[in-house]
Amino acid sequence: MTYVISDLHGYPIEKLKTLLKKAGFCEDDFLYILGDVIDRNGDGGVGILQWLLSQSNVQLVLGNHEAMLLACAFLFDEITDDSIADFDSEKIEILSNYQLNGGDVTLKSLAKLNKESPETVCDILDYLRDCPLYEAVTTGGKDYFLCHSGIDKFEKGKKISDYPADAFIWAWPEIGDEYFDDILTVFGHTPTMNYGEQYRNKIIKTRTWIDIDMGAADGKTEPVLLRLDDMIEFRN
């Protein structure tokens, strides 16, 4: 079975494990997390990141928040005269932007972990650098394209390799947008309630795409785990 979930934003790792247990998730199954496990709440998602390092049947697809964290990876470099000299206004702006987007809680958790186990922080950053921008999967007799945000400025017939990286992590689809005719695109990034109050806590399914972001970034709303094989939803 193939499962997807997105935009956990600091969701407690123990609650995620409970949710997976509720779905009957086992070693023969596969879970795709469609970006944004970090920032905003709790431990900033660092617990999930540590867990991911040892999961062979779970894959994080890069989200815009992971991309922002990677842009701030210089914070975990060894402090030298050169690194101090390189800390310019551009890096300050990158850091400020990340903090404005809820990155403080993740940076604090990583800083604490860096004192205890700097090699683990290095492993986390390396893991994030290797995360794919998208995945193409077939399950339950259907083809799916999985990414964080949908596809910005989508053009039918355009090669996926011709899109810039930001197209898969910073898109804000309109409800009437369409993607592939024969492949369902699954993403998060835009909380479904942003499309109207009638979609609050509900997955949106259109002819060509599915949005599974329930808005857990608020720290109160529960995320949804979707099993693609039969479209059954699981929640805590």
Region spans (language model):
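A general structural motif
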Residues: M1, C26-D28, Q55-N57, G141-K142, ...
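Short amphipathic alpha-helical segments
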Residues: K17-T18, G45-V46, A73-F74, K158-K159, ...
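Acidic, His/Gly-enriched loop-helix segments that form or flank divalent-metal centers
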Residues: L100-D211, G215-T221, M231-R235
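Active-site environment of divalent metal-dependent phosphoester hydrolases
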Residues: G10-P12, D39-N41, A67-L70, G188-Q198, ...
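Active-site glycine-centered loops adjacent to acidic/histidine catalytic or metal-binding residues
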Residues: D7, G35-D36, G63-N64, H189, ...
